[in-house]
Amino acid sequence: MPEIDVENRKETDIWKFETTPRMSSYLLAFVAGDLQGVTATTKNGTLVGVYSTKAHPLSNLEFSLDIAVRSIEFYEDYYGVKYPIPQSLHIALPDFSAGAMENWGLVTYREVYLVVDENSTFASRQQVALVIAHELAHQWFGNLVTMKWWDDLWLNESFANMMEYVCVDAIEPSWNI
């Protein structure tokens, strides 16, 4: 959730954030570090940001930012439901065992699935787009609407698996996904 106040103290600072909507505890995430990022706003006003360590130039985050913004806009139009919270932040983590995790409003990724440079192949760009679209699909299937118990996790994953292709095909039709 967006930061609403920072109290600067002598040895430590205190950050206050907007109250989150009700959510499953497994969707909660915090990230702290010396990060840099790029941001944009969707046509409906959602702040979208892509962040990494300073080991990567900011230009390596632009592709992912563009895909994230267009994916959110696609899903809002497709579902007829606005993105449910005020921001969508995407963080490239240098040592992350999972491929990505759809924490609500703070999606975490292995660096290879978010950082794109001038040497990235077309196939790797497609893979990055699919992973971003997959994680953003979970913001509706799995986060906004959460299954009652883990037995039904397959529903979250199957919807996200299908929708990543529907989304990327819609926002990048020349790719013939």
Locate each region found by the language model:
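Catalytic Zn2+-binding segment of zinc metalloproteases
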Residues: L136-D151, V166, A170-I171
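Acidic active-site catalytic centers that drive phospho-/nucleotidyl reactions
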Residues: H134-E135, E157
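Hydrophobic helix-coil surface modules that form long, contiguous segments used
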Residues: M1-A133, M162, S174
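Active-site metal-coordination segments of metallo-dependent hydrolases
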Residues: L61-L65, W149-E157
